[in-house]
């Protein structure tokens, strides 16, 4: 999606190129490239099981990555940041349909609270940097994404890749029953990754502030 816009240069580092938890390595990498536009998509992401098992890591690593990337972008003179948020920032107390102004209503759900608080903190940081430094941003509140190159892992993956992994493992083992949490009635909004990428590009061109990034269609998990 980005390459279709024919940018003069595109730098998409992997973890092997730069550990974003390392402050100085992150600042150095961003300073060396001196980007005009920064898409901040990095984070320590897990499914329900991983979020419950690694609460400290979820908060520390996400908060540290966000601090390093946003400050590094400011130091390097970036003109704008487009950052990936999450619907986990919303509380169960938020009215439906959820609106961007409701992000601070009540605490996040306990199952994802550390991860969600780190993501809320990034929004607060971006707002503070816009106020003090005049750094524009778009904060994309992403729903459940799925698509190529996902993490097909029952601990670290989201709903769709976790279920695919579980079905595949069960089939490979020759088992006849699949054990899933709950009764499948909870609903989620699932968004294809390429559609999310297109929304990010649109936000980079003209967006300011927080945006819910979703289809607007709720689907029961069992479907």
Protein language model regions, located:
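SDR active-site strand-loop-helix element
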Residues: 13, 38-44, 81-87, 140-142
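Active-site Tyr-X1-5-Lys
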Residues: 68, 92, 110-143, 162-173
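Conserved Rossmann-fold NAD(P)-dependent oxidoreductase catalytic core, especially the SDR/UDP-sugar
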Residues: 67-112, 138
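Flexible, glycine-rich beta-alpha linker
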Residues: 19, 89-91, 114, 138-162, ...
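Conserved catalytic-site region of short-chain dehydrogenase/reductase
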Residues: 48, 83-99, 114-120, 132, ...
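Alpha-helical substrate-binding/gating segment
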Residues: 131, 145-148, 160-178, 188-212
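NAD(P)H-binding glycine-rich loop region in Rossmannoid oxidoreductase-like domains
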Residues: 12, 23-63, 75
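Short-chain dehydrogenase/reductase
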Residues: 59-63, 107, 111-123, 153-161, ...
């Amino acid at each position: 999606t980005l390459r279709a816009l024919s940018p003069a240069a595109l730098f998409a580092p992997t973890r092997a190129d730069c550990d974003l938890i390392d402050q100085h390595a992150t600042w150095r990498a961003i300073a060396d490239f001196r980007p005009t536009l920064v898409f901040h998509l990095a984070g320590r992401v897990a499914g329900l099981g991983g979020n419950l098992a690694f609460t400290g890591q979820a908060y520390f690593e996400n908060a540290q990555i966000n601090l390093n990337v946003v400050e590094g972008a400011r130091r390097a003179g970036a003109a704008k940041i487009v950052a990936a948020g999450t619907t986990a920032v919303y509380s169960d107390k938020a009215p439906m349909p959820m609106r961007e102004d409701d992000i601070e209503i009540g605490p996040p759900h306990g199952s994802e609270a550390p991860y969600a608080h780190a993501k809320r903190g990034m929004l607060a940081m971006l707002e503070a940097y816009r106020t003090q430094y005049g750094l524009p941003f778009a904060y994309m509140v992403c729903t459940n994404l799925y698509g190529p190159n996902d993490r097909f892992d029952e601990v670290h993956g989201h709903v769709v890749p976790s279920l695919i992994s579980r079905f595949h493992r069960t089939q490979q083992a020759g088992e006849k029953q699949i054990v899933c949490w709950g009764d499948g009635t909870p609903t989620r909004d699932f968004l294809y990754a390429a559609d999310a990428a297109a929304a990010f590009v649109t936000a980079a061109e003209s967006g300011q502030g927080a945006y819910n990034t979703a289809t607007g269609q709720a689907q029961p998990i069992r479907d």
